[in-house]
């Protein structure tokens, strides 16, 4: 059964302006610890951050909490499986919260020249 859906769109140039203005502090606000190496290695840091931010916003909307405890920006991370499919990873507290409620999340990400779009679906098992 579907618990919730969420979507978010982010303009990459807006993220670039924030990166230009605030540098590493801006990235640190958005990224979970597990995402920092990927960011450092990225050829397009603004696009990398835009994807993560959109995915986390979409997750919070699907969960119904917004980006707030337990679904903070640092508690949700984006990774990929061996075939490149995006997936969510969670900090310990959020993983427990989801497990207690029998919830699992799915993520779709797409990007074009100027925008990134994320769609999240959370289902109750």
Swiss-Prot record:
The keyword ATP-binding does not apply. GO terms for biological process: fatty acid biosynthetic process. Disulfide bonds: none annotated. This is Holo-[acyl-carrier-protein] synthase. Its main location: cytoplasm. Keywords: Cytoplasm, Fatty acid biosynthesis, Fatty acid metabolism, Lipid biosynthesis, Lipid metabolism, Magnesium, Metal-binding, Transferase. Its cofactor is Mg(2+). The keyword Lipid metabolism applies. GO terms for cellular component: cytoplasm. SUPFAM superfamilies: 4'-phosphopantetheinyl transferase. It comes from Aromatoleum aromaticum (strain DSM 19018 / LMG 30748 / EbN1) (Azoarcus sp. (strain EbN1)). Mg(2+) binds at residues 8, 57. It is an enzyme of class 2 (transferase). Belongs to the P-Pant transferase superfamily. AcpS family.
């Amino acid at each position: 059964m579907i618990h919730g859906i969420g979507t978010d769109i982010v303009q990459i140039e807006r993220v670039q302006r924030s990166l230009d203005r605030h540098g590493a502090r801006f990235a640190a606000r958005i990224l979970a610890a597990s995402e920092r190496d990927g960011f450092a290695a990225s050829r397009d840091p603004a696009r990398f951050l835009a994807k993560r931010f959109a995915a986390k916003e979409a997750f919070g909307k699907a969960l119904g909490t917004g980006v707030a405890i337990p679904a903070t920006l640092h508690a949700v991370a984006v990774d990929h499986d061996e075939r490149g499919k995006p997936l969510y990873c969670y900090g310990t507290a959020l993983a427990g919260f989801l497990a207690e409620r029998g919830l699992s999340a799915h993520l779709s990400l797409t990007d074009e020249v100027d925008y990134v779009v994320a769609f999240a679906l959370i289902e109750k098992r």
